[in-house]
Amino acid sequence: MFFPSLILAAGSLSTLIQAIPHGAKHHHSLHRRAAATYAVMGGDGEASDGWPTISQWSEYETLWGLNQILIAASCDNSDDETSDINTSIKSIASETGVDARFILAIIMQESKGCVRVQSTNNGVENTGLMQSHDGEGSCNKDGSKTTPCPSSMITQMIQDGTAGTTQGDGLKQCYEAQTGGTAAKYYKAARTYNSGSIASSGNLGQGGATHCYASDIANRVRGWAGDVSECVEATIGTITSGVESALGGDDGSSSTSTSTTAAQSTETAEPVQTSSSAAEQPVTTEPIQTSSAPAQAAETSSAASSATSTETTSVAPAPTWTPSSNVQVAAQTTTPTPSWTTKSAPAATTAPAASSSASGTAPLYPYASSSCQKYYTVKAGDFCDKVTEAVGISFLDLRSLNPGLDEKCSDLWLGYQYCIKA
């Protein structure tokens, strides 16, 4: 029996957190947990440059809880599939010595935790949850999706990205190739995993591929998990230090996932203009490597614990990682990435008009009928019942014209044009 869905397309995870639909799955109750704000990190990843140390990373269970909300909002995973990600992360972390928090951060950066994420190819086939180097694990081979995604395949995806493949390094190899403090080696490993190398300057915001990659990962392990990074690709390479110098914390040789995080801080980091780009005890130690971010991917985070932060005198207090009840979400760009789109409660607004032909500005939903004659652009606050009522078609017709829509209509993409007549 079909039940009208209340999952919507909107622009901010904070709206989703405040308006979970009735009958939502139990993991949505995690919305009361705090999420850290984003702080742009530039330079070489070392604590001396203001990057967070291992002691400033959030605990794994906190990170998992916050990112679980984003996975639910961004993907078509079943509860079992999402649970299998959690189980596999901890298992592979134990086998490889790679910190479970780091593995989770890379998964969220690369695929937003969507088990049926498509592969990408920029000269190398990047597959699965971690977009590994020619990995064997995938539940979306050549556009053919596997549902349900077997737990063994989910484990294989995480194995490929963490331990490496026959064709390329994983996180473990990337980590072991680095020097410096434990946390810095992770940030450097993240950059290597993304681009294959680090710029000769040592600045993690320079070089190829995604310039903000290391900054994003440093924020993720610290408790941020937003939809869109507040780091600016065009300028991050000019920044030579982080914004967290005022925070204490040793960067010892061992990493522990039970460490506390900065709680109340003196001042939140100023938001930066955004740019877009594609479990029990966590196991820690030394891990890590490589690939470019996929076109289909999804993000949001956690924080909060015991330690209090210090306040500076005279000069303005340094920006710090302040826990916040609402995730910082950047404004949507002109070409939003589908899996990064979050859904929220419907707004009481009039329905936007449908267009008789594809718009030149809004992107087409990739699974729309190839013979489509009329389109509708999804607006903030839209949900399937609202769209079908506005354009005068049934939900079954909407699905037949846009085969990518699931039966619960849980994956409307904000800003995309859907077919409403063929």
Curated annotation (Swiss-Prot):
Effect of inactivating the gene: Does not affect radial growth rate and colony morphology, nor lesion development on apples.
Assigned protein family: Belongs to the secreted LysM effector family.
Name of the coding gene: LysM1
Disulfide bonds: none
Region listing for Disordered, in residue ranges: 242-360
The keyword tRNA processing appears for this protein: no
Residues the record marks as carrying a glycan: 86
Polar residues bias (residue ranges): 271-288
More details: In plants, chitin acts as a microbe-associated molecular pattern (MAMP) that is recognized by lysin motif (LysM)-containing plant cell surface-localized pattern recognition receptors (PRRs) that activate a plethora of downstream immune responses.
Keyword Glycoprotein included in the entry's annotation: yes
Induction comment from the UniProt entry of this chain: Highly expressed during the infection and development of decay of apple fruit.
Signal peptide span: 1-19
GO molecular function: chitin binding
Taxonomic lineage: Eukaryota, Fungi, Dikarya, Ascomycota, Pezizomycotina
Domain LysM: 374-420
PANTHER family assigned to the protein according to its UniProt record, in alphabetical order: AM15, LYSM DOMAIN-CONTAINING PROTEIN
Segments of skewed composition (Low complexity): 253-270, 289-319, 330-360
Protein keywords: Chitin-binding, Glycoprotein, Signal, Virulence
Protein name: Secreted LysM effector LysM1
Function: Might have a role in sequestration of chitin oligosaccharides (breakdown products of fungal cell walls that are released during invasion and act as triggers of host immunity) to dampen host defense.
Domain notes: The LysM (lysin motif) domains are small globular domains involved in binding chitin in eukaryotes. LysM1 contains one LysM domain.
